[in-house]
Design a protein with these regions (language model features):
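Hydrophobic ligand-binding cavity/cleft-lining segments
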Residues: 2-6, 19, 26-130
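Residue-level detector of alpha-helical recognition elements and their boundaries
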Residues: 113-114, 197, 240
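Short, highly charged C-terminal tails/helix-capping segments
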Residues: 232-242
Length: 242
């Protein structure tokens, strides 16, 4: 991130801060003495038990504020964007298998996939595949409240991050609000390297978004994509045997 490495200890510190924040935001009790990993695992179970409707009901006022703030930021930003970019290296999988596993988790609306998508980052309140879209409810960076938006895959209107042909697998899509307002987008690109894979993940925000949000979202990307990649490594048989 910004040509600087971010180690496991720093990621753990970030996760602990943010997982506790989500517990509080959802009005859930937690064990202060539990490890960060335990807190994250229990939070995932609690989110699953609550279900989509109950979670949205708890944070509906925050989502309305998020919607308003994104509309204002988008209108005042025009076509200008800021980018949160994080590069990740991993061993134990190749791009071909990773792509198929990620497609499986992203496009198939199953109970297992919903749980996986909640588990990879404590800031995920909901990630729900809906035909050609992925509904996302998450806290982006250190924003004051969670946001709701929809990623329309394989559409690139307004995406400013160019495709790099050296990365054979990509996830690209526009991010829009419920009313269709385009607020940004994603272009995540992946390739095989000598020892595993290299992932360059990028999210585009309206330019008016504070730098602090964009910078913190780089860590969010590191956490969630490390989680997805590790899950893919552990579940390669999903596609190898199909």
């Amino acid at each position: 991130m910004n040509e600087k490495s971010f180690d496991a200890k720093a990621l753990e510190k970030w996760k602990r801060k943010h997982v506790i924040s989500v517990y509080k935001n959802l009005g859930l009790s937690y064990d202060w003495e539990a490890s960060t990993e335990q807190l994250c695992e229990v939070l995932t179970e609690k989110k699953v038990d609550l279900g989509y409707d109950a979670i949205v009901a708890k944070i509906q006022n925050q989502l309305k504020l998020g919607d308003i703030s994104l509309k204002i930021a988008t209108k005042l930003s025009g076509k200008r964007r800021k980018k949160a970019t994080t590069k990740i290296y991993a061993e134990g999988i190749d791009v071909e298998i990773l792509g198929r596993v990620i497609d499986h988790v992203t496009y198939l609306n199953t109970a297992e996939n919903l749980k996986v998508n909640l588990s990879v980052c404590p800031e995920h309140y909901a990630l729900v595949p809906r035909e050609e879209e992925l509904e996302v409810i998450e806290k982006t960076g250190n924003a004051p409240f969670p946001m709701q938006f929809f990623i329309r895959f394989n559409e690139e209107e307004g995406i400013q991050t160019p495709r790099d042909e050296e990365y054979p697998y990509q996830i690209v899509g526009i991010a829009k609000l419920k009313d269709g307002t385009i607020i940004g987008g994603v272009r995540h690109q992946f390739r095989n390297v000598e020892q595993g894979i290299e992932a360059v993940t990028c999210v585009e925000f309206p330019a008016l978004c504070p730098n602090s949000i964009v910078k913190d979202h780089q860590i969010h990307l590191a956490v969630e994509w490390s989680g997805w990649i590790q899950w893919a490594i552990d579940h390669q048989d999903l596609v190898q045997n199909s």
